[in-house]
C-alpha cells in the first residue's frame, strides 16, 4: 500500500516540517512505523474472528478508516503555518498530525496483517498459490523501487530554509503527500471492494440483482 510507504518514508520529514524537534523524531517514527501497526494487527485478527468472520469484510472496513485518516491528514496540511517565517505549525497542530498518522498506520497494520488470507477466501487453486503470491508480490512491492524517487523528485522543489538556516518542506509538499496518500487509499478501497464481490458472488462485477435469477436458471436447466 502506497499510503504506508508515504508515511514510513516521509513521516519524519512531515513531522519535522510541522515543527517537531529533531531529537524526538527517532522515538516518534519508531512508534508509528513499528509499534502502532502491531496493535492494528492484533485488532484486525480479533474483529475478523469475532465480528466480521471474513478477511475481505475486515479489509474493506479498515480501508474506509484509512481513507478517513488520510482525509484528516489533508485537512491538517491545508492549515496555515502559525509561524510563516519558520515554517512551523503550532504545537497543537503538530501533535494532532502525529495522532492522525498513528491512526492511519494502525489500520494499515491491520490490513497488512491479514490480506494474504484472502487467497483462501478467493479459493485460489492450490496448484497456483505460489505463482499467485509471487505475481502479487511483484506488483505490490514494486512501489518500493519507484515511489521514493517519484515523491522525492516531486516534493524537493518545495524545500525551503527558515531564518535559522534549517531546511524543511513547505506546506505545498505536505499537501502533495496528503493528496497522494488519499488517492492511494481510495484505490486500495476499490481493490478491496472487488475482492469482497469476488468472495461473495464469485465474480467481480456481477450485479447482485441477477444473482437469484442465475441461481434459478441453473436449477431449472441443470447448467
UniProtKB/Swiss-Prot annotation:
Segments passing through the bilayer: 28-48, 59-79, 88-108, 128-148, 176-196
GO cellular-component term (any): plasma membrane
Keywords in alphabetical order: Cell membrane, Membrane, Transmembrane, Transmembrane helix
Cell membrane found in the keyword field: yes
Topology relative to the membrane: Multi-pass membrane protein
Keyword S-adenosyl-L-methionine in annotation: no
Location within or outside the cell: Cell membrane
Any one Gene Ontology molecular-function term assigned to this protein's record: transmembrane transporter activity
InterPro entries hit by this protein: MFS_dom, MFS_trans_sf
SUPFAM superfamilies documented for this protein: MFS general substrate transporter (SSF103473)
Protein name: Uncharacterized protein MPN_113
Native source organism of the sequence: Mycoplasma pneumoniae (strain ATCC 29342 / M129 / Subtype 1)
Taxonomic placement: Bacteria, Bacillati, Mycoplasmatota, Mycoplasmoidales, Mycoplasmoidaceae
Amino acid at each position: 500500500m502506497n499510503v504506508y510507504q508515504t508515511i514510513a518514508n516521509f513521516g519524519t520529514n512531515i513531522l519535522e516540517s510541522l515543527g517537531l524537534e529533531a531529537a524526538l523524531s527517532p522515538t516518534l517514527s519508531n512508534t508509528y512505523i513499528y509499534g502502532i501497526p502491531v496493535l492494528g494487527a492484533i485488532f484486525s485478527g480479533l474483529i475478523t474472528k469475532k465480528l466480521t468472520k471474513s478477511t475481505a469484510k475486515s479489509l474493506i472496513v479498515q480501508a474506509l478508516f484509512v481513507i478517513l485518516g488520510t482525509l484528516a491528514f489533508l485537512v491538517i496540511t491545508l492549515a496555515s503555518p502559525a509561524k510563516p517565517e519558520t515554517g512551523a505549525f503550532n504545537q497543537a497542530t503538530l501533535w494532532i498530525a502525529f495522532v492522525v498518522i498513528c491512526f492511519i498506520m494502525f489500520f494499515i497494520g491491520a490490513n497488512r496483517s491479514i490480506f494474504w488470507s484472502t487467497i483462501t477466501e478467493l479459493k485460489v487453486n492450490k496448484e497456483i498459490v505460489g505463482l499467485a503470491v509471487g505475481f502479487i508480490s511483484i506488483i505490490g512491492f514494486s512501489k518500493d523501487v519507484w515511489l521514493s524517487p517519484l515523491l522525492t523528485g516531486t516534493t524537493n522543489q518545495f524545500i525551503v530554509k527558515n531564518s535559522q538556516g534549517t531546511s524543511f518542506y513547505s506546506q505545498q509538499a505536505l499537501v502533495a503527500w496528503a493528496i497522494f496518500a488519499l488517492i492511494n487509499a481510495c484505490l486500495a478501497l476499490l481493490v478491496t471492494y472487488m475482492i469482497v464481490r469476488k468472495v461473495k458472488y464469485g465474480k467481480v462485477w456481477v450485479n447482485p440483482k441477477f444473482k437469484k435469477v442465475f441461481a434459478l436458471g441453473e436449477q431449472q436447466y441443470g447448467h
